[in-house]
């Protein structure tokens, strides 16, 4: 029976060597996408600085430089959030696989003890060959389940190590609370795609403001105003669609947390049952 990874995990936890999730999340800063996004922010900040120092700059030049920096910062936040999400998912998989493995270890111990007891009963005439076959099947199934859990743990640990290096997760003691209701609006405000659309709209409006109706052709003005109206409609539609998705996910958080609590209770009940047996 394979036990080394589960036993090692227990030993590391007992020695205080398990590492908490907040420490793992710090590794997100080292993700390639985050590093590249940070370099882009630094480059756009330098571009803005040069633009502001240029005595010949126009209002449009400054607007574009500021927008470029703001968009780069939004993309950095997105890259960091995505990197953190990947770490959380991998970290959680390791914790879940380890807990499941510990339960299945107990299940195998119980199945093997039951098999030995059945073998003794068969010899004494207290059980039939069918009883023995059923006990053997239960032990075999328990062994197969534990082997699968072992492979799942190895896979989860490899995935986590690929993101943060060698890491022994510490179980999350307390579930996080629900975020504030204003989170949806904050996410909409920071969304890089919406920000890019807002920037494009602001740029078109700035270009329209620079057009002198005394000199610009009416068709050029109308064409620009049509672009502004079309982009405003596109922005409203994109924001509305994203808001619907975010609000749906926000509403799904309470039942999700409740499901986690119930799963924890079921796992604890299973552990106690196998320990009692």
Predicted regions and their residues:
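Charged, solvent-exposed structural "stalk/scaffold" segments
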Residues: 30, 37, 41-48, 53-55, ...
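Regulatory alphaC helix of protein kinase catalytic domains
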Residues: 21-22
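Amphipathic alpha-helical coiled-coil segments
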Residues: 76-79, 141-156, 235-242
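Hydrophobic h-region of N-terminal signal peptides that target proteins for export
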Residues: 9-18
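A glycine-/polar-enriched beta->alpha junction
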Residues: 26-35, 46-63, 77-81, 85-88, ...
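Positively charged n-region of N-terminal signal peptides that target proteins for export
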Residues: 1-4
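Short, solvent-exposed, mixed-charge loop/turn linkers that connect secondary-structure elements
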Residues: 148-185, 221
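Long, amphipathic, heptad-repeat alpha-helical coiled-coil stalk/linker regions
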Residues: 119-123, 143, 150, 171-173, ...
